[in-house]
Structures are given as C-alpha cells and as structure tokens.
C-alpha cells in the first residue's frame, strides 16, 4: 500500500489499461440492434389510381317492361331509321303522295357478368387489429379494381357480335406493312430489316402491358388464362388479330438510318405489336422475327434495333397461333364482353350508317386558325352534314393533351396568324406559366344554340386516341323516344357476396350484370393513330 491507497502504482496502471481497452471495443447497444421506436403510421395507404369518368357519364338503368323489373339474356330494342327516303313533298292537284317507307333494325346486346374476388386469412385479419382493417382493405380494393376494369370495358369491350346491329367486330388478319428507310436513326450498316405486325384492340394494348410483359419471353398474350377462386379455368381472348404477312425487306447503310413502318388500319385497332427480323435478306421468316414492342399509331419509326431482338430473347413471331383473338364473345367459361363506346362506333363502319372513325396515321393535330382543331372540326362537320348529330364531350388520351392544347392555342402562318397573350389579373400582374383548356365550342347544334363540349383526359383510353361520343339524345324533336344514346342496362346492380367457409379464409366477391346499349351508333367520332408532339 502506498500513500494509503488500496493498490500500488503497478496495480493502478494495470486497472487503467484494462479500462481503456474496454472503452475501445464495440458498444453493447446501437441502433443496429433494432431497439428503436418504429414510427409506423396508423393505417396502410392506398397508393393506386382509380378512374371511371366514362362510366360516370353513362346513365345506369334497370330493365323494365310495363313498369316491372325484368330479366332476360339480352337487352333488345328496335331502331326506326330515316323514314320517307322514297318520296318528295310535291303532289299532283287533287291527288296523294306515295306511302313513305319506315325502315327498322333490331339490335340486341348480351348481358355479361363482371366480377372481382378477394380473400383474407383469419390470421391476417386478427394480426391487423390495432393497425389496419384487412377485411375492409380487401373489400375496398376489389371494388376499385372492378371500377377500373369496368371503365375499360365501357371504352373498348368487344363482343365481336356484328350480326345484331353492328355492335362488335373482328380484326381478322392484320394488313401487311410496308417499310421505308429514313434518316435520323442508328440502325447498324448492312442490317436487313423486315417486320411482322399484330393489330391490337384496346384490350390488346392493355394486355400486352400487363400480361405479355410477364411472359418468359416478353411479347403479347393472345389468350389470358387463370384459375378462378372456385377452381374453374377462365380463358379470355387477348385482343389480338391474326399476324400479318411479312413486310418488304430494307437494308440500312451507314449506321445513321431508321425505318418507317406504315400499315393500313382497320376500325377498332388501337395499336400494333411489332416483330422485327434482322436475319433474312430476301424471304422473312416468323421464326427469325422477335417482339420489339407495341406502337399505338399506324405509322411509326424504328430508329434502332432493340437488344431483345438482336439477342433473340423476346417472343418470336412463330410462337403465335394463327387465330383471331380480337373479340371476347360468350363461351362455356365466360360471359364475355359487352361492347364499349369505341366498339359501337368502330362496329358501325361495317353498316350503312357508319360513325366518323378515322385513323390519322401518325399525323398531329393542326390549328384551323380560329381557335379550333382542324381534324376535329372536319369530324364534327361530317357528323352534322351526314346525320345532323353533334358530340357531347371530347375525351382524349393522356399523351394527346399537350398536342390538342397546342393546336387550339396556335395559328397557322400567313394573314390569319395571331398571338394570344394571357396573364393573371392581379394588381401586380405576375407572369404565370402553363394553361388548361377545359371546353370546346361546337359550331352546330340541334336547336341552333351555342353548344360547348367539355374536354376530358381519360387515363384508360389507349394512347394517341380522341373519342367524341354523343351521350345524349341527338334527335329530341323526333318524339323524344331516346332516353339517352348510351345506357348501361343493369340486370343486377353491384352486389357483394361473402362465401361459406371451407377453410380459415374470408372469401368474398363483388359483381355486376349489365350491358351497354347504344341507340344511335353512327353518332360519334373516333380518331386513332393521332400523333403527339413527339411524333414527326
């Protein structure tokens, strides 16, 4: 003991050294141990889109006869077409005119059942207590999924049943494309290029993005097949036409060329699956053509060869069956599609009274010099001059919003050119960028009054598409017998079911039985393959 200490100097040195060494080692507890407060918000957030503006524009009705609700397999109605086409008004003195003809047509639309199912295990429900109502989440999710799918069906559902009033169509064989070399690409020199095309309906474009992309070799899904909650096999057509014949072969030189693809469009086509062959120099083979993507205009540019084509890793054209899957009629394991708004218009082109269905082949909107869009003005004038009808709304795909707005706010060069300046009307007049076009004035109406058409962006409308339907009665003076041009006839409105327990799973579904009526299918405008601002 030194100076009254319990430890001598040597022992104190050893203690200090040992203590210092312990401080240099890793601490016992850090944030990596996970002993931290978890600031989890009190509920899960629904971070997915739900849009159904077209559904909201169409009235929903229950089928009735003499004031009583009725069922049946179809909604059927008679159309009285233009009477009196066989006479003129002048009659001889003291005589009479010929009897007028009154042509009619019978139209029907099959009821279909749409539905979505969901399941929640008992453990999931009990484990979510205090955080999230998992049953409630599943119920809301299936309703939202049904609304999104029903919206798409209302736009481009296709029964293919053209024999009952031109409601529905089949695309059959895709027309043969033609190729032309263009400058401005990066296709390697001495590359032989040919293509095969598959025309796609609205469902075809959607399915290529959502099912075809998940194939082992990405491409298009000609059929969608899965097992239902009750063990049945559901098989639906993928919205695809038969594949085209091969195009001509072009040979790139110099490494700075691109290939322009053109094909004659068929009504009801919203896109094309493209298969590129860079192997054959004379006679292209489907076995050497590989999926290169989906284009939504009938004229487009291939500026480079995708890696999936040169690497032969995407779907080969030879993998496709030579079958037309462009329509979804009722079959043994599905009630099929009802015909959507665009299908009623496209289907009418096969009859005596066609709607205005025009493919612009990649051409962009142009200004008419008076605040209007020339292509839309031509369509509206045609509808009025031919049938004395006008649209009730302008519905455009998301990609066309800038192009449509630019055309409205631009003027062509020359004496009629003009510039419009708009600024915010506040005392200091700050500059504000951006603009929003919400309405479009129609030059025609049934009563000679000003008619203003709302402009709506429709998220589920296929790209490069403008739809201007007539939703209301276009002929109110003709006896007012048309309640609305389009009506959703609901044999059974939305109903939810919770199924008996066969395991410790809550099983439930939501369904609706309905069909879409159209009394005047020639009243409407459908412009496809409209070039956006990025299309030359």
Per-range role (PLM):
Residues 2-51, 126, 133, 308-389, ...:
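Sequence/fold signature of self-assembling virion shell proteins
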Residues 33-117:
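Assembly/oligomerization interface modules of large self-assembling protein complexes
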Residues 47, 51-77, 140, 144, ...:
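Hydrophobic alpha-helical segments involved in membrane association or supramolecular assembly
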Residues 104-122, 342-352:
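Short, compositionally biased low-complexity segments
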Residues 114-137, 154-160:
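Short acidic, glycine/Ser/Thr-rich loop/turn "cap" segments at secondary-structure junctions
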Residues 135-138, 146, 376:
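Stable alpha-helical elements in mature extracytoplasmic
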Residues 143-151:
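Sec-exported extracytoplasmic/periplasmic mature domains
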Residues 160-352:
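Disordered, low-complexity "stalk" and linker segments at domain junctions of extracellular
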């Amino acid at each position: 003991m030194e100076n009254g200490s319990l430890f001598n100097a040597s022992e104190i040195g050893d203690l200090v050294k040992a203590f210092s060494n312990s401080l240099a080692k890793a601490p016992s507890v850090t944030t990596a141990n996970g002993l931290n407060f978890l600031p989890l918000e009190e509920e899960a957030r629904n971070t997915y889109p739900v849009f159904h503006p077209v559904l909201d524009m169409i009235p929903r009705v229950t089928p009735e006869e003499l004031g009583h609700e009725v069922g049946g397999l179809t909604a059927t109605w008679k159309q009285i077409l233009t009477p009196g086409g066989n006479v003129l008004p002048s009659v001889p003195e003291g005589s009479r005119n010929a009897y007028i003809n009154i042509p009619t047509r019978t139209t029907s639309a099959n009821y279909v059942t749409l539905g979505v199912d969901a399941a929640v295990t008992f453990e999931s429900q009990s484990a979510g207590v205090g955080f999230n109502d998992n049953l409630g989440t599943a119920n809301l999710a299936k309703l939202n999924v049904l609304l999104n799918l029903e919206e798409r069906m209302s736009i481009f559902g296709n029964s293919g049943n053209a024999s009952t009033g031109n409601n529905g169509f089949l695309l059959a064989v895709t027309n043969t494309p033609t190729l032309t070399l263009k400058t401005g690409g990066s296709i390697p020199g001495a590359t032989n290029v040919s293509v095969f095309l598959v025309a796609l309906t609205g469902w075809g474009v959607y399915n290529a993005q959502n099912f075809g992309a998940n194939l082992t070799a990405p491409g298009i899904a000609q059929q969608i097949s899965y097992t239902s909650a009750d063990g049945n096999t559901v098989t639906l057509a993928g919205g695809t036409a038969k594949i085209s014949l091969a195009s001509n072969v072009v040979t790139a030189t110099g490494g700075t060329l691109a290939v322009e693809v053109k094909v004659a469009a068929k009504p009801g086509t919203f896109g094309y699956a493209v298969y590129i062959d860079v192997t054959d120099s004379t006679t292209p083979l489907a076995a050497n053509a590989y999926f290169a993507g989906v284009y939504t205009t009938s004229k487009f540019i291939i500026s480079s060869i995708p890696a999936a084509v040169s690497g032969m890793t995407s779907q080969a054209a030879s993998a496709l069956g030579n079958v037309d899957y462009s329509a979804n009629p009722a079959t043994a394991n599905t009630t099929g599609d009802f015909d959507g708004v665009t299908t009623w218009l496209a289907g009418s082109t096969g009859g005596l009274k066609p709607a205005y269905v025009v493919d612009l082949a990649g051409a962009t909107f142009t200004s008419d010099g008076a605040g209007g869009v020339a292509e839309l003005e031509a369509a509206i004038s045609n509808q009025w001059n031919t049938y004395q009808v006008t649209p009730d709304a302008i519905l455009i795909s998301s990609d066309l919003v800038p192009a449509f707005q630019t055309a409205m706010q631009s003027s062509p060069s020359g004496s009629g050119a003009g510039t419009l300046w708009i600024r915010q009307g506040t005392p200091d007049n700050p500059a504000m960028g951006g603009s929003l076009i919400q309405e479009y004035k129609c030059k025609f109406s049934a009563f000679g009054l000003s008619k203003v058409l709302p402009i709506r962006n429709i998220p589920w409308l296929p790209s490069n598409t403008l739809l201007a339907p007539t939703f209301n009665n276009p002929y109110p003076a003709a006896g007012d017998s048309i309640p609305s041009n389009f009506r959703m006839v609901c044999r059974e409105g939305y109903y939810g079911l919770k199924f008996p327990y066969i395991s410790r799973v809550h099983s439930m579904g939501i369904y609706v039985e309905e069909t879409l009526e159209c009394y005047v299918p020639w009243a409407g405008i459908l412009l496809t393959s409209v070039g956006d601002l990025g299309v030359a």
